[in-house]
Amino acid sequence: SIAGFLLILSQAFSVVANLLGGYYADKFGRKKMMVISSLAQGISYLIFALASSPWLDSPAISFICFTVISLFTSIYWPASQAMVADVVKEKDRSSVFAIFYTSTNIAVVIGPVLGGFFYKDYRFFLLLAAGLLNILLSIVLKIWIAETAPPYKESVGTKKNWIMALGTQLKDYQVIVRDRTFLMFILAGVLIGQTFMQLDLLLPVYVDEMVATQSLFSIGSWSLEIQSTQAFGLILAENGLVVAIFTIMVTKWMSKYKEKNVFIVSSFIYAMAVIMFSQTNLIWGLMFAMLLFSFAELMTAGIQQSFISEIAPENQRGKYFAAASLRFTFSKMIAPLSIPMSAWFGFEWTFLIIAILAVISAFIYYVMFKQFEMKKRNLQAVKQL
């Protein structure tokens, strides 16, 4: 329970850091925040390594380092996304963001594998390597990356203390909250997030309890028997493989269609996949449902970030990307409710409720794009006057 509380506390700090990171990326520049974040992560990893070394074993210092690393990761993220939006033409952003999405997913697959092999017996050297790589990254960013942020215009006034500066930041984010298009984008993202967050929550519980040991395929008298834990690993690996191989291809395909249609259809496919999970306990059925699920994920993998950069004013991209990441944070906070719900209502009803949330997100996307298109038409009309 203490570990859970500490993780929640760390997550709360990360939310604040993410919002501040977006603000500072706009104010001080993308490059500066990326360099500082990488260097801070590197130093934190080195201290983490020392706290997990043969000479010192301190869980308290390890947790502090873990929290600091999470904080600066949250600061790095909006700055890096805003930099991509600064340098890439609007028509190419979906493809570029898709490449980043692919590389991130490959890292998510490789990272736990390396951790599984080295963390237990070679923890010090693993953390030391992570620290040195982050410091190397900060040097590379400092020397070879150019600043891309537009000049920051701060209102003229008296010099602010840190409390006044914090108040100014909150007021800046109030402007974003008043952007109804963006607000609906976050709301729809939180609802659709209840589907893909179940990969780590409801789905493994469902597979463990409902999927019996069965033959995946057989040749003559020989057959490959798969247990429930192996079945979950198999469909999770399928998702990772599909994402790693087909993200760029699917993103290019989706760029031929209107963003509105892509978002809406993706939500409906998510709903279909979730319902299919609840209707089968066969491994092949689960694999087909996961294929649909993965396709729904890939449909919006690149265009989500591209859409954020489209609706965000050029001088506020850092803040918009930071605020947009809250849809994942809120999703993580709400999604675990599916576990007690499965005990109260059963798996079938729980999956159905999640599917309904996905359908509601499709409706919100429809309203959002209708409003966004009207807003664009009004702006064009004003320019023509």
Residue ranges of predicted features:
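Juxtamembrane intracellular "pre-TM" segments in multi-pass secondary transporters
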Residues: 148-186, 382-385
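C-terminal ends and interior cores of transmembrane alpha-helices
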Residues: 39-56, 268-281
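Helix-to-loop junctions at the C-terminal end of transmembrane segments
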Residues: 17-30, 245-259
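Helix-loop junctions on the cytosolic side of multi-pass membrane transporters
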Residues: 138-157, 367-381
